[in-house]
Amino acid sequence: ASQIKEGGSLVLKKGLPVGFDPSAKYKSYTYSITEPADFCVENMELKDGYYQFDLKTPEFRIEKLVLNYPGLLNVENSVAASALALLAGVSHDAIRKALASYSGVKRRFDIHLKNENFILIDDYAHHPEELRATIQSVRDIYRGRTITGIFQPHLFSRTKDFAEGFAKSLDLLDEIVLL
C-alpha cells in the first residue's frame, strides 16, 4: 500500500489480515461475494452453469449482471475487476457487456470434455483456497454427481507449506488420484 499515490485507491478482499494506515492519503475499499463489503454480491443465482447477481457498490447497485463462466472464484474476480473499473470511471453498461462476454483463461475451470457420463475440467488451482473454491463450484454446478479429482502438486515448498490446507480442500472430493 505504500506505493499507492496520493488520491489513489486500494481495493482489497474483505477479511484479509491486513491493517490500514488511518493517515493514508488514499481511499480503501473492500470486496466480497459472501459478506457485506464496499463492493459485494447480492442475489446470486446459479442458472445452467452461469451466475447472475447484483453488484452493490458504495453508491449504487448494478442489477442482474451475468457471468457466463462457471466458478465462484470467477465471480469473486469479476467483483474485484468491476470495482477497479468503476473506480476508474468505466460505465455500468461496459462492465455488464464485459462480464457477459468473458470466456475465461486457459486452465481455469477449462472444460475439455462434457457428455452425459462425465465432465473433464482442467483447473490450475495452486493454492488450497483456489482448490476449495473450484471443487465447491463443481459441486454447485453438478449436484448429485460423483466428483473425482486428479491432483498434481507443484513446487515441493508450496505443497509442504500448504499441506494441511490442500488436505482439507481435497477432502471435499468423492475420489482422488494423486500424481
For each of these PLM feature ranges, what is it?
Residues 67, 122, 151-153:
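Short glycine-centered, acidic/aromatic-flanked micro-motifs in structured strand/loop junctions
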Residues 120-126:
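Switch II (G3) loop of P-loop NTPases
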